[in-house]
A protein has these predicted regions:
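Solvent-exposed loop/turn segments at secondary-structure junctions
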Residues: 26-30, 79-83, 108-112, 133-136, ...
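Short alpha-beta junction capping motif
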Residues: 21, 73-112
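Aromatic-Pro/Gly-enriched surface loop or interdomain linker
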Residues: 17-73, 77-80, 170, 178-179, ...
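Extracytoplasmic/secreted envelope proteins and their assembly/folding machinery
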Residues: 36-43, 89, 93, 111, ...
């Protein structure tokens, strides 16, 4: 555990020179590979607008791999089942407690499975709704109502849930908003420009928060 923490802190210390983010390849049958253009587009937007230097191509990492400690931000999405083994649960817990940040974006149909698995990772913590006053919604772009609605799905209000450890947000779950769809190439969903821009700006806020906290 100590060596993993040391490695992670070292990697975070060189963030000014190079940054890399990753997509989580999880088991369970859900389509972890959904939205293939979303992270590259978010990276491009951030590098052009908020002075990040993220590598253009995101990595792909499995939850049980020690490689997860190489990435300050790991993104996951999908429409179906998510399943973590005991080793993966321990590895993900250590990752987040050591300074890493995991973000699951519900692509519709993920909710019941993800809630079950997150409870295994943090059995003594509950997902709590993140208030609109939280810094993640404040800068560099302002979202006074909190997480934006990108795709309607069944019309429920968008919500951002989190797990906090020692007052630090370590896990983010974006529900009923579908940020990742908004990050995709314009022709994939034919979203209006302003909707895509709203999604990308919220994504930029997430990365800005991670790199500065």
């Amino acid at each position: 555990m100590k060596s993993k923490l040391t490695t992670l802190l070292f990697l975070f210390s060189i963030i000014g020179f190079s940054q890399e983010i990753a997509l989580l390849k999880y088991n369970g049958g859900g389509d972890w590979y959904a939205n293939p253009t979303s992270l590259p587009n978010l990276i491009k937007f951030c590098n052009q607008n908020i002075n990040t230097t993220i590598k253009n191509k995101p990595a792909t990492v499995e939850p049980g791999s020690p490689d997860i400690f190489s990435y300050p931000y790991i993104h996951a999405t999908g429409h179906g089942n998510v399943l973590f083994s005991d080793n993966e649960i321990l590895n993900l817990r250590n990752y987040m407690l050591s300074g890493g940040f995991l973000h699951f974006d519900d692509n519709y149909g993920l909710d019941e499975y993800l809630r079950r698995e997150i409870k295994k990772i943090f059995p003594n913590s509950n997902l709590v709704e993140i208030p609109a006053s939280h810094p993640i919604f404040q800068k560099p772009y302002s979202f006074p109502s909190g997480i934006p609605k990108i795709h309607e799905h069944d019309g429920k209000r968008p919500q951002a849930y989190g797990i906090f450890e020692n007052n630090r947000l370590v896990f983010l779950y974006t529900y009923e908003c579908d940020l990742g769809d908004g990050w995709e190439d314009a022709e994939v969903h034919n979203d209006p420009k302003e909707v895509r821009e709203k999604a990308l700006k919220m994504g930029a806020n997430i990365l800005n928060y991670i790199f500065n906290n």
